[in-house]
């Protein structure tokens, strides 16, 4: 079902952890000013792992950027560009698992973040939720991208798609609550936040050791981002253009990804059925408003097979759903068909009841030329969602807590 993806991740079926040889990524080249510019940013340890995997895979048509508060981890990451966040604050020693440190470090580096990313049309942000740098810094990165575009008078703001992992239950309640708040903070400034629930991932491959499971999560994110990027940028069996992706993902709120593979006699249909069954987030179908479906296929797959598979998607999601799809040929797939379904506008308990009403419009603000001091700005109030005071119990009513914070917004406009 997903064994080909495991193989491509360098995870053997016998659970041998020896990685397979990977290809080297070409240098990023973006000389054509009329080209859609795509940037992929990995924030924190988990995000850096995804960027490294994308670099090894050789994703074409996108610039890869790694950001971290840990200088040693950043040194080992593979990317076209790297940025150490909050150098004067953390001295390159990391966040210690504290989202507030990640947030402060990103705030102190806001100008550098803007300059490193530059002007882009589509930005993917990858991070792990529940720890320090990814949880605290990723929302700041998303905000800076939007603010730079507004500050520069861009007619259309960049499309920001965040792709994050949600921790295992056995990682503890504290980390889970940090992750929920981090996702909610990301929703303020991302158009769409794709959430991959680690426990759901483990259900697909229950016998994997924990380190291989994390690598599998990196592979899913990397393949998803690579697939969308190259289907936009390169000639494909069926292209998805940037306008299609923008239509589905703009103001999409929270999103899930489902993944499936098959080499059966009815492989495309079975791959889609598996993808719809293998949801990597706890949601009910029917709650999503829009969907993006991407197929990775071998050279002998026909368009008729793909069309038949898409009929399953239309039947499952309903006539009123807006659905875009594309397909790319990958010689390594052989007889296998892989389907990835991204559904936006979903409701999940991991985003505080699943409501997207708190996805606020970006406030006008100039990019800081110097690090901010104190905690009095609009962004600092938003950050209180991430960094909750120690006297608040993890099981407290976070919904009420956020609403109380949002009550201050009117005073800031």
Curated annotation (Swiss-Prot):
Gene encoding the protein: ftsZ2
GO biological process: cell division; FtsZ-dependent cytokinesis; protein polymerization
Similarity comment: Belongs to the FtsZ family.
Binding site for GTP: 132-134, 171, 175, 218
InterPro entries in UniProt: Cell_div_FtsZ (IPR000158), Cell_div_FtsZ_CS (IPR020805), FtsZ/CetZ (IPR045061), FtsZ_C (IPR024757), Tub_FtsZ_C (IPR008280), Tubulin/FtsZ_2-layer-sand-dom (IPR018316), Tubulin/FtsZ_GTPase_sf (IPR036525), Tubulin_FtsZ_GTPase (IPR003008)
Protein known as: Cell division protein FtsZ 2
Quaternary structure note: Homodimer. Polymerizes to form a dynamic ring structure in a strictly GTP-dependent manner. Interacts directly with several other division proteins.
Organism name: Thermococcus kodakarensis (strain ATCC BAA-918 / JCM 12380 / KOD1)
Function: Essential cell division protein that forms a contractile ring structure (Z ring) at the future cell division site. The regulation of the ring assembly controls the timing and the location of cell division. One of the functions of the FtsZ ring is to recruit other cell division proteins to the septum to produce a new cell wall between the dividing cells. Binds GTP and shows GTPase activity.
Pfam family, one: Tubulin
Primary site of residence: cytoplasm
Cellular component, GO annotation: cell division site; cytoplasm
Keywords: Cell cycle, Cell division, Cytoplasm, GTP-binding, Nucleotide-binding, Septation
GO molecular function: GTP binding; GTPase activity
Localization terms from the record: Cytoplasm
Gene3D superfamilies: Tubulin/FtsZ, GTPase domain
């Amino acid at each position: 079902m997903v064994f080909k993806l495991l193989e491509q991740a360098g995870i053997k079926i016998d659970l041998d952890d020896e990685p397979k040889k990977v290809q080297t990524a070409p240098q990023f080249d973006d000389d054509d000013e009329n080209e859609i510019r795509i940037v992929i940013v990995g924030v924190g340890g988990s995000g850096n792992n995804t960027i490294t995997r994308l670099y090894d895979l050789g994703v074409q048509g996108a610039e890869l950027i790694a950001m971290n508060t840990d200088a040693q981890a950043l040194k080992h990451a593979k990317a076209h560009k790297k940025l150490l966040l909050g150098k004067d604050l953390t001295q390159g020693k990391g966040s210690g698992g504290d989202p507030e440190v990640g947030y402060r470090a990103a705030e102190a580096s806001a100008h550098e973040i803007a300059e490193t990313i530059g002007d882009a049309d589509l930005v993917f942000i990858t991070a792990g939720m529940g720890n320090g740098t990814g949880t605290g810094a990723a929302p700041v990165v998303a905000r800076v991208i939007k603010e730079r575009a507004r500050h520069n008078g861009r007619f259309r703001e960049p499309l920001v798609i965040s792709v994050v992992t949600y921790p295992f239950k056995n990682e503890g309640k504290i980390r889970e609550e940090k992750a929920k708040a981090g996702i909610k903070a990301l929703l303020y400034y991302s158009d769409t936040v794709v959430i991959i629930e680690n426990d759901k991932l483990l259900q697909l491959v229950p016998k994997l050791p924990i380190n291989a499971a994390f690598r599998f999560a990196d592979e899913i994110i990397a393949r998803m981002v690579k697939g969308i990027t190259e289907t936009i940028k390169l000639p494909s069996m069926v292209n998805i253009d940037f306008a299609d992706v923008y239509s589905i993902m703009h103001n999409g709120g929270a999103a899930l990804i489902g993944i499936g593979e098959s080499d059966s006699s009815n492989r495309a249909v079975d791959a889609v059925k598996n993808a719809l069954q293998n949801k990597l987030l706890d949601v009910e179908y029917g709650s999503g408003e829009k969907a993006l479906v991407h197929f990775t296929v071998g050279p002998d797959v026909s368009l008729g097979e793909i069309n038949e598979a898409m009929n399953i998607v239309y039947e499952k999601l309903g006539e009123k759903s807006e659905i875009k799809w594309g397909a790319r040929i990958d010689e390594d797939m052989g007889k296998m068909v892989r389907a990835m379904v991204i559904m936006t506008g979903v409701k999940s308990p991991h985003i505080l009841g699943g409501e997207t009403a708190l996805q606020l419009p970006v406030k006008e603000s100039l990019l800081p030329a110097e690090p901010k001091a104190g905690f009095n700005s609009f962004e600092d109030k938003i950050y209180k969602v991430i960094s909750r005071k120690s006297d608040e119990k993890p099981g407290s009513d976070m919904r009420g807590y956020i609403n109380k914070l949002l009550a201050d917004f009117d005073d800031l406009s």
